[in-house]
Amino acid sequence: MSLSTTAFPSLQGENMSRSPIPRHRALLAGFCLAGALSAQAATQEEILDAALVSGDSSQLTDSHLVALRLQQQVERIRQTRTQLLDGLYQNLSQAYDPGAASMWVLPANPDNTLPFLIGDKGRVLASLSLEAGGRGLAYGTNVLTQLSGTNAAHAPLLKRAVQWLVNGDPGAATAKDFKVSVVGVDKTAALNGLKSAGLQPADAACNALTDASCASTSKLLVLGNGASAASLSATVRARLQAGLPILFVHTNGWNQSSTGQQILAGLGLQEGPYGGNYWDKDRVPSSRTRTRSVELGGAYGQDPALVQQIVDGSWRTDYDWSKCTSYVGRTTCDDVPGLSDFSKRVDVLKGALDAYNQKAQNLFALPGTTSLRLWLLWADAVRQNIRYPMDKAADTARFQETFVADAIVGYVREAGAAQKELGSYAGQRQQSMPVSGSEETLTLTLPSAQGFTAIGRMAAPGKRLSIRIEDAGQASLAVGLNTQRIGSTRLWNTRQYDRPRFLKSPDIKLQANQSVALVSPYGGLLQLVYSGATPGQTVTVKVTGAASQPFLDIQPGEDSSQAIADFIQALDADKADWLEIRSGSVEVHAKVEKVRGSIDKDYGGDVQRFIRELNEVFIDDAYTLAGFAIPNQAKTPAIQQECAARGWDCDSETLHKLPGTQHINVDQYAQCGGGCSGNPYDQTWGLNPRGWGESHELGHNLQVNRLKVYGGRSGEISNQIFPLHKDWRVLREFGQNLDDTRVNYRNAYNLIVAGRAEADPLAGVYKRLWEDPGTYALNGERMAFYTQWVHYWADLKNDPLQGWDIWTLLYLHQRQVDKSDWDANKAALGYGTYAQRPGNSGDASSTDGNDNLLLGLSWLTQRDQRPTFALWGIRTSAAAQAQVAAYGFAEQPAFFYANNRTNEYSTVKLLDMSQGSPAWPFP
C-alpha cells in the first residue's frame, strides 16, 4: 500500500467529527433540562470549532468536551503513525548508534511529523516529516558516512526509508540511476552512502535547493549543514510542497547549527538542545523490537495515557504524601513514589508547547498543529473554572488537573482568555486594568551585555498586546512576562496551591520591526530580555494594548521629581497589584502592598528618601564594600593608598566589574524560605532599604569561596558582612540601632575557651565552632570571626572609620587572585611560593577559603596571623603556612576582640589570648 499521501488529520485536511455529548448529562432528570443541556453543549461545540481557528477561548468553559476532541485527534495521529512506521520497519533490525557527536532531531508539528528512531533513553535520533504534503527524513548525524561501518546494520532500514521518500512506498524500489541533488554535504560521500544502502543513485549535478529547474527533475534532495539559500526555511518548505523529497543529515556533530535549525524548521522539525547526544549517548539497541519502536513513535509527544486520564477524570488518589519533606517553609514531594514520572510527562508537554512560545510562533496560524491547539484550549477551559486554594491530598482531582493545565500556556496568539481567579498572585483589579488603544513608544537603555530590564508596562489578563522593537544592533531580544521563580508557587504545601504554577513566561523572541501579538491568562509585568548587547545602547520598543502599573524610572543625573510625583499618584490611585522601580543598578518587581507598607511605616511616606536609601544605603553600600569599580566613584584615599603600596590594580573595570542589574522580587512567596538569593532574589517581607534581610540576600550574590571559612559552613555567614556593615553605618549616620544582638561574641569566646582546654586545641575549637554542618548553625558565633578583622584593622590604622576597609581590600585581593595574570602578579598578591593559581573550592572539607583568608590577612596586616586562625579552629594547608612563614613577618599573638553590642564599636575590648584565656570583660 502506498503511504505517499498519508497525512495526519488536521484543520487543513479534514472536518473533524465532533465528540458526543457525555452520557451522564443525558441522564439528568427531565426532558426539558436534557434538551437545554444539549443545546448548551452544541454551543460549546461551536465555540470550540471557532477557537480552533482563532485561538479565542474566552467563552470556552467545557474542558471535558475539549478533552474528548483531543483524544480523538491523538488517536487518529497514533493510528496514522503506526501504519507508516510499521510499513517502514517491517522485520528489519532496529539497531542504530549515532554516537556522542550527534544531535537530536525532534518533531515539532505533531500532526505532520513523527519520530523515526527513538533511543532507549527516549531521545529522538531521526524524524520523519509529512509537512506541506511532502515527505522528509532528518538524521542527527551524517548517517550516510556510517553505513559501511558503525551503522552497517541500519543500511536496510535506511533503504526502505529512502524508497518511501522517493516513491511514497517503502517497498517500492527506486529506479536505477535516480537523480539525487546533494547540497551542503560532501557529494561523493553522500552518494556512496546511498549505494551502501543498496540504492543506485545518480548525481543530478545541480542544486535542487536553489534551482527550480533542477528540483523538477531530481528525485531526492540531500541536504547538510553547509546548504544556503535566501529564506532557507521557506525554500525547504516550498520544495517539499512541490513534491521533492528531502533527506537532511546533520553534519555539525553535537553542536547546534543555525543553518540546520532553518532546514529543520522547513521540514516541520526542530533541533535538539546544546550538546545534543553528547551526554546521553542514546542509541537504538539491536534487541529493540519492531512492536516497541512502533509503540514509542505512535505515542511520542502525544501522551495518550495522560489524555485518557483527563477524559475519564481517573486521577491517581494513592500518592504517599508522607514522603514529602519541608525546609524553611517550602514543601517538596520529589520522593513521593510515582509523582516524578507524572511530573516529567507534564514537563515534556510543557516543553513542546514552550518551543513555539520561545520562537514567537502562533500555533493557531501554523498548519499541522491541531493536537497542540486542543491541548492549549483544554488548558484554557480548565483555567476558567480554577478556584484557589487547593490541597494535594484533599483536592486530588482538581489539584492534578490544574497541575497539568498550568504547564500549558500559549502566549503567542491573537486572542485568548483570562484566568478568572489568580489567587495570591493578583486580585480582581488586575482583570479590569485599562489598556492603551494606541501604540506607545518606549526607549530603554540596556545596562549590560545580557540580562533583562523592565519595559515599564504590563499585560492585562486575557487582553491582546502587540509588541515590536526597532533596530537593536547586534543584540538578541525577547519579551517575557513576570519575574517569579517556580518556587514562588508553594503548591505542595498544605492548602497553598493558591496561584498559577508558572507565572514567569518563557522568553519570547523578538525580531526587529516584526510585531508579536501576545495574550496571557494571568497578565504580568513586561520584561525586555537581551543578550549580545553593547552596554549603554538604547532600544525603542513599540507596544499596543498594554496596561500601566505604578512604575518609577530614576535616571542617573536627571531630575526625578516629576517621575516620583507620577509614581506617588499612581500608588495613591490604588488600581494595580504590582509595581516596578528601576533605579541605578537595581530593579524592583513588587506587590504594591509590600512596598507601600514600608514607605508609609518606615519612611513616613517619603518616597524620595526611600529611593535614595535604596540606592545609597542598600545597593551602593554593598558594592562599595565589595570593592567594585563603580562609575564616577573613586575608591577612598585609604583604599587607594593600600592598593598603590602593594602594586595592586584596584581600578580595572575588567577585574572589578560591577555585577549586572540586581533584580528583586517582593512577593507573597519566595523561591525558598522567606528570602532567597539569586538574580532576581526574592523576599516576602516589605522592602526596606535598611533591612537586614535585603542585604543578607544581596550578600549571597556577592559572597565568594575564597572568603569563606570551611566553604559551605560559612555559606550563611560570609554574606552577612554586608548587612553588618550597613547596620554599623545606619547607627553612625542616622542614629538608628538595628539588629544589635546579631553577633554573638560572648558564646564564640566561650566555645573557644572550652576548645582550647583539649589536648588538641585547634581540633577542640573546630569541633565546637565549625563542625556542625547545619545551614544556620552557630550563625552569630561564626560572624564574630568576620568582625574580628574589622576591629583589628581599625586598631592597626588607628582610625575606627577604616575598619571595614579590610573586607574591601580582601575582595579586591581575591578578584586579582582569581583573574589577573598569575605569574606577573602572584608575588604582589602574597602568593610568591605558589607555582599555580590556588584552588577555589567551596567544599567544607577544603581549606581553599581558609588558606586565602590566612594569606590575604597576613599579607595586608604584615603580620603572621597563624596563631589567631588556630585560636578559632581554622585549619590551613601546609602550602599556605609555608607561604606565611616565607613572608618573614613578626608573629601576631592570638587575639580576641570582645563586645556586647553588634553595631557600636566604641565598646570593643581587645583580649590577649597568647597567655591563656582572660576573663570576659563585660557583665
UniProtKB/Swiss-Prot annotation:
Pfam family, one: Peptidase_M60
Record entry for activity regulation: Proteolytic activity is blocked in the presence of EDTA.
Cofactor(s) annotated in UniProt: Zn(2+)
The protein's Enzyme Commission number: 3.4.24.-
Residues noted as binding Zn(2+) in the record, renumbered to the chain: H696, H700
Function, in words: Protease that degrades several proteins of the host immune system. Cleaves P-selectin glycoprotein ligand-1 (PSGL-1), leading to its functional inhibition; PSGL-1 is a leukocyte cell-surface receptor essential for leukocyte recruitment to the site of infection. Next to PSGL-1, targets host CD43 and CD44 that are also involved in leukocyte homing. Thus, prevents neutrophil extravasation and thereby protects P.aeruginosa from neutrophil attack. Is also able to inhibit the decay accelerating factor (CD55), but not the cell-surface receptors CD46 and CD31.
UniProt protein name: Immunomodulating metalloprotease
Organism, scientific name: Pseudomonas aeruginosa (strain ATCC 15692 / DSM 22644 / CIP 104116 / JCM 14847 / LMG 12228 / 1C / PRS 101 / PAO1)
Lineage start: Bacteria, Pseudomonadati, Pseudomonadota, Gammaproteobacteria, Pseudomonadales
